[in-house]
């Protein structure tokens, strides 16, 4: 089974359909160094069968006539051997792939955005471009203008991920996945009237209300329930 860094560009943010998808294989060497597998690379534009929003056109530089004669986004298929899928805000990419009828039920997701927020909370931005400026300023200076092109974004993601793994002694994919799963559980509320408040300090009635919301992020749900269980244990 293999691991891939993937990036998608989409027609918009609501029910996103792919306009461009790129991926490349990655593997840890026996010495624990993250390396690219350039022979396992893919890049293609797709017709999203939806009008590309002005916002997406401005960000990606992909216009309706650029993809009018491209294959439909539903033609895309993940490699059959894919076990781990890595991306910056990977859940957005997963939504794009799901809308392209890809089955992700057995795929383990690794999120570099969550890892960066967890390991480097002091940074003023955790966007992919900002992280590239932080870890690889010389590369960023020459190439940041190509951000939001899927081919370049998977390269940027690799450089950011390689730096994170090196600094935190992550040497295999299973260890990286566990680090990502831990990082994806928030410790601070990122929205709502209690934005910025530590999960452990949230009012119990607000936690109860949140847990009843059908569209609650599963990692926030996990953080809330684990904290509630811990608080209950402390009272016993």
Where are these regions (language model features)?
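Hydrophobic/aromatic-lined pockets within catalytic cores
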Residues: 120, 124, 136, 159-169
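Sequence-level detector for tyrosine residue identity
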Residues: 4, 23, 84, 146, ...
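Conserved non-catalytic scaffold segment of RNase H-like nuclease domains
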Residues: 1-109, 114, 121-148
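Acidic, divalent-metal-coordinating active-site segment for phosphoryl/phosphodiester hydrolysis
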Residues: 149-161
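A generic structural signal for short hydrophobic patches within well-formed alpha-helices
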Residues: 115-116, 207
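Charge-rich, low-complexity amphipathic helices
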Residues: 78-81, 119, 137-138, 153-154, ...
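Acidic two-metal-ion nuclease catalytic site recognized across multiple nuclease folds
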Residues: 160-236
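Generic preference for hydrophobic/aromatic residues in regular secondary structure cores
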Residues: 18, 38, 119, 176-183
């Amino acid at each position: 089974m293999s691991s891939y860094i993937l990036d998608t560009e989409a027609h918009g943010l609501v029910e996103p359909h792919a306009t461009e998808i790129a991926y490349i294989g990655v593997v840890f060497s026996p010495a624990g160094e993250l390396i690219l597998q350039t022979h396992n690379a893919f890049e293609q534009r797709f017709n999203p069968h939806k009008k590309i929003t002005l916002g997406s056109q401005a960000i990606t530089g992909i216009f309706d006539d650029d993809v009018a004669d491209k294959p439909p986004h539903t033609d895309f298929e993940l490699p059959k051997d894919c076990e781990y899928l890595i991306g910056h805000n990977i859940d957005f990419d997963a939504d794009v792939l799901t809308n392209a009828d890809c089955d992700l039920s057995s795929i383990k997701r690794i999120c570099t955005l969550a890892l960066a927020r967890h390991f480097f909370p002091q940074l003023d931005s955790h966007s992919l471009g900002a992280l590239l400026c932080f870890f690889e300023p010389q590369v960023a200076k020459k190439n940041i203008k190509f951000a939001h092109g899927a081919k370049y974004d998977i390269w940027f993601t690799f450089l950011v991920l390689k730096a994170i793994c090196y600094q935190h002694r992550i040497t295999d994919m299973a260890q990286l996945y566990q680090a990502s799963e831990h990082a994806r559980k928030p410790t601070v509320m990122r929205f709502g009237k209690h934005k910025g408040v530590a999960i452990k300090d949230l009012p119990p009635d607000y936690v109860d209300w949140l847990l009843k919301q059908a569209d609650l992020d599963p990692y926030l749900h996990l953080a809330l329930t684990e904290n509630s269980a811990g608080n209950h244990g402390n009272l016993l």
